[in-house]
């Protein structure tokens, strides 16, 4: 919410989900921001979203997702609009948090590179239907469905001649 400080958003979430006091929520908010790699987290609680870079805003969203101490997080396009170096940092953060917290993550994305980087398994949906699923290596190396094949062929590689994509 662009009209609320980061601290207000985190505290509100913590108070509602964990039923803790405002003071405890503030301390937990600082811990959450620190855990997602936001430097100097305490003064950042009083900042508004527009005062953060895209990568930092994404870290705050991850902190918000972790506020209720979930077993599973669903991340919808978590790296969209981030440059490739920040994207890598966010993916590394997600992987690290999964290990530290024994956390499951479902990532919704169209980015084959993100899937290859972070996923163990992949499910491909087309027109609202599950059309293919399996281990990432299996699906990416030997896709069975035409939609999966077209997604993979849309990823540029340095060893191909340029060609027009079909729609």
Enumerate the language-model features and the residues they cover:
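Short, glycine/charged-rich "phosphate-handling" switch motifs in NTP-dependent
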Residues: 121, 133
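Helical segment within the ABC ATPase nucleotide-binding domain
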Residues: 88-101
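Short catalytic/signature loops enriched in Gly
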Residues: 39-42, 135-167
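A short, surface-exposed alpha-helical micro-motif characterized by mixed small hydrophobic
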Residues: 115-117
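Conserved ABC ATPase "signature" region
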Residues: 24-43, 152-153
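A short, proline-enriched helix->beta-strand linker immediately N-terminal to the Walker B motif
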Residues: 67-71
